[in-house]
């Protein structure tokens, strides 16, 4: 396993480091690493679940898979991995955190995102390409995609049905925390486009602060034209642009303080 202890001071202004967390049972970590490293100005590194610090990284990715065999519930054991304290602490101070598929489940179990992911309504494992519609275009993960943009992304899960009680659902909609919904090829949200029975066709949500995003589809598997879609790369690029803008703001503030 590859661990990371390089100093953040060694990074250039134009290079960003993403941490890809590896739990026992993760199987999309390589996909995430390849997708991120394929983008200019980005470098991803694996971080083993027993590590305790993510200070060297600009963003965190929790990949798909079957962390700890999905025993008890999907993500229920991974939530107690040593690295998760750092994930939670960094999320609370504004660092970008992305959870795909099993990573989304871990984020819900950790309390970083509301709701829960339960068994698909069909009681079957679903593996197919789906269409998602961007509902929010001012989040750090989708600001490069105008509202209504359609993203073709693959799904592969058995427990991807998003559920939330009525109060939580109202809050999600009121605060514009629903980032993606399953839709048909015309962009219409219909039951037939929903692969797992998720309430209100919800495919991905963010926290109220908008720096934590979880989705069941795999942007990492849609970041190479040879795989049939490059739409997933838009999510990673949006993260890069957000971090770059934040750096520019911080630099400007430092200049003002010196002046």
Provide a role label for each language-model segment.
Residues 67-68, 104-106, 161-162, 186:
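Glycine-rich nucleotide phosphate-binding loop and flanking beta-alpha elements
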Residues 17, 88-92, 117-259:
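Amide-donor transfer/coupling interface in amidating biosynthetic enzymes
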Residues 1-100, 108-114, 120-126, 133, ...:
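N-terminal beta1-alpha1 cap of cysteine-dependent amidohydrolase-like domains
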């Amino acid at each position: 396993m590859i661990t990371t202890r390089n100093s953040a001071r060694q990074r250039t202004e134009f290079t960003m480091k993403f941490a890809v967390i590896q739990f026992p049972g993760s199987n999309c970590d390589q996909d995430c690493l390849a997708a991120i490293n394929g983008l200019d100005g980005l470098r991803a590194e694996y971080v083993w679940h027993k590590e305790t610090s993510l200070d060297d990284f600009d963003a965190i990715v929790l990949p798909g898979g079957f962390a700890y065999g999905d025993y008890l519930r999907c993500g229920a054991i991974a939530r107690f991995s040593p690295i998760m304290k750092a994930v939670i602490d960094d999320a609370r101070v504004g660092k970008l955190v992305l959870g795909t598929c099993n990573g989304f489940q871990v984020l819900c179990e950790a309390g970083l995102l509301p709701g829960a992911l339960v068994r698909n309504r069909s009681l079957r494992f679903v593996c197919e390409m789906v269409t998602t519609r961007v509902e929010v275009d001012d989040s750090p993960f989708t600001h490069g995609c105008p509202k209504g943009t359609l993203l073709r992304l693959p799904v592969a899960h058995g427990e991807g049905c998003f559920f939330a009680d009525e109060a939580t659902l109202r809050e999600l909609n009121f605060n514009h925390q629903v980032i993606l919904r399953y839709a048909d090829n015309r962009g219409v949200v219909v039951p037939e486009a929903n692969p797992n029975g998720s309430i209100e066709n919800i495919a991905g949500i963010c926290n109220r602060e908008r720096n934590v995003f979880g989705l069941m589809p795999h942007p990492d598997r849609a970041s190479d034209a040879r795989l049939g879609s490059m739409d997933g790369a838009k999510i990673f690029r949006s993260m890069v642009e957000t971090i770059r803008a934040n750096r520019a703001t911080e630099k400007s503030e430092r200049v003002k303080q010196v002046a």
